[in-house]
Amino acid sequence: MAPDSGPFPDGQFLKLLPVDPRDRGTQRCRLGPAAFRSLGVRLGSPMRISLPAGGCCLCTAWPRRDGADGFVQLDLQCASPGAAAAAGRISMDRLQPVSCPPLRRLEVWPVLRPQAGAPSSDAVLEVSQELLRNRPVSRGHVVATPPGIPGPVAALHVVSGTPDPEPAGRVTPHTRITLSDKPPPQVEPPGEVTLGGLSETADSLRELLRLPLCYPLALAALGLAVPRGVLLAGPPGVGKTQLVRAVAREAGAELLAVSAPALQGTRPGETEENVRRVFQRAQELASRGPSLLFLDEVDALCPRRGGPQRAPESRVVAQVLTLLDGIHGDREVVVVGATNRPDELDPALRRPGRFDREVIIGTPTLKQREAILGVITSKMPISSHIDLGLLAEMTVGYVGADLTALCREAATCALLKNEKNQNNPKIEETDFLEAFKKVQPSSFRSSIGLTDIRPVGWEQIGGLEDVKLKLKQCVEWPLKFPQEFARMGLTQPKGLLLYGPPGCAKTTLVRALATSCHCSFVSVCGADLFSPFVGDSEKVLSQVFRQARANTPALVFLDEIDSVLGSRSVGSSGCDARERVLSVLLNELDGVGVRTVERRGSKASQQECQEILSRSVMIVVATNRPDVLDDALLRPGRLDKMVYVPPPDREGRLSILKVCTNNMPIGLNVSLENLAAETCYFSGADLRNLCKEAALFALQENGLEATTVEQEHFTEALKTVKPSLTLKDLTFYENLFKKELSNLEDH
């Protein structure tokens, strides 16, 4: 039956469009009614399609959802190695219906995903049977695992079968599937570009690009203007450029990538001329097929207008706005802008009709970092003992570029360590630990308060066992065991107040907490916040929380908070700035400070963004004067938990002395028990100072040849080192602690 050219706008050709994201992994070929009649096929009929760019695929015929003729969409779930559905036209002669007899036996060779430990053959066979169930296959073709499906198998290469699956054969529940021992030559499983942690964002971007590129006629029939602009916002190094290139390749669109700063000219009008030339080039590419114009660092080209000094920038912004408004509806052009400073863009650029949609790419989460590390290390000879999940926990705040640099540095360390075995180097866990010392997350650079802390273990803090347990229950357990807490209906406190006498390890406890939780540590003091300019302190505090939310999970530590914040109950005009800082802190604790550009993930997860970000940032404050803090700060929902850090008792002092003398050569006549009894009113800082003074006395008496610290040296040190605490101080804090207990009992 000869094809009828009437329903086809291009004669005997069909326009090849990108696959519908809903059809990924279904092995469907979407055709119009005229193509069904011309080919003489029915719903689900197998077809072998020769692709214009080379290779072929095996699909089943399905009708288009919009019923439009003259178009075809292919899912390359089962295709020859290297096959690609590039945008363009495809002749009707390339679509051939084929017979598909049931197969009694099928031999396949599995392509496994890179992961720690090799899966068992039974597990691979079970996954292969599920992947091939009721599918038409062809000898020499590769069946790729659908996107988003976990498991050890990335793809299956069809080796042979009975009867011979050439041109096609169907797998049934009675087909006996076996695994081949030898890989076939030139195996390259088709599939989507591996984006490592950006799959969810890529789906959102694909959805936006699919409408104007795949359904222009259907949208025109509905009288809808297709989205013509997309703005990607996110910190540097998260993969915005890589994401656009990968999605354009998958969509079969011509990509015109331009760096916006490169368009800047020196003479008047040169920048506008360069911008017009770029848009004209994108329109020319659209005449041959879908076109995607990518403007990287678009904030450098279109900054916020205002003031007579910014007249040149205003002219450039006006030119870009005119060009965006002038994109013809019949031209398949999508403009994508990328920026890490969305607030610096001119507001007119972000209205509907220009950059219609905004896709926010945040700092990678734990699961995303693990996926990125899996992609980066897939072609690296890493040891089987390396746990990528543990590496992901240790890389809080790292973006994709940082993780790439970390793996590259680890490979360099392995190469230098194994100079004699350069032909077969192996990357061990120690190489990554060395790389951590050299590669810091880019989000930590030039950031207020973000601190690279020296690891502090709980065992390095003597005594305070009850305080340690409370801190673990409030902060560490909710982060490490979220499912158990959710099962019991427990939520993580938003804030924690540590109060007690000075020198009792409040700051050290917070550092140990950040070390055990593997989270970002943001330490802020009064010098970081206060500024002589009105409103500057509030802006800095908001920026601190914004940076913490960008590097979640994060621990924000405000030390000596009584010197930073004011109390509104004290009617002093000199506290105006401190009261404004207090107001900003209360808003941040309540989640009011979460901005739109801090959204992450899909639409469903964006609705829960405020709650998630607020829960992922824990604030810990420390003070010696909790009585001067504002009552609104201490209510439940803000600083939920108040933990009293008492001065060490006799057992606590003994534990602290053991920690302080752990690396000190003390003599056999030194009695730490007696020292603990003689050091009443000594804080932890006083005891550490006492041990240092004793060691100095040993050096003074015996010279540089001194080998031990004796009891008499500690006795001399006790004469010079005096306790920093008094009975009056202890009474003051004990009364505060009793008052807190009485308040809890009243509630």
UniProtKB/Swiss-Prot annotation:
Regulation (activators, inhibitors): In the context of 55LCC heterohexameric ATPase complex, the ATPase activity is stimulated by DNA binding and inhibited in presence of RNA.
Keyword Repeat listed: yes
Function: ATP-dependent chaperone part of the 55LCC heterohexameric ATPase complex which is chromatin-associated and promotes replisome proteostasis to maintain replication fork progression and genome stability. Required for replication fork progression, sister chromatid cohesion, and chromosome stability. The ATPase activity is specifically enhanced by replication fork DNA and is coupled to cysteine protease-dependent cleavage of replisome substrates in response to replication fork damage.
Top-level taxon: Eukaryota
SUPFAM superfamilies, A to Z: P-loop containing nucleoside triphosphate hydrolases
Keyword Magnesium: no
Protein's name according to its UniProt entry: ATPase family gene 2 protein homolog B
Chain residues that bind ATP 1: G234, P235, P236, G237, V238, G239, K240, T241
A GO molecular-function annotation: polyubiquitin modification-dependent protein binding
Cellular component GO terms held in the UniProt record: cytoplasm; cytosol; nucleus; spindle; VCP-NPL4-UFD1 AAA ATPase complex
Record organism: Rattus norvegicus
Signal peptide: none
Keywords: Acetylation, ATP-binding, Cytoplasm, Cytoskeleton, Hydrolase, Nucleotide-binding, Nucleus, Repeat, Ribosome biogenesis
Gene3D superfamilies membership: 1.10.8.60, P-loop containing nucleotide triphosphate hydrolases (3.40.50.300)
An annotated GO BP: mitotic spindle disassembly
Binding positions (ATP 2): G500, P501, P502, G503, C504, A505, K506, T507
Cell compartment(s), UniProt: Cytoplasm; Cytoplasm, Cytoskeleton, Spindle; Nucleus
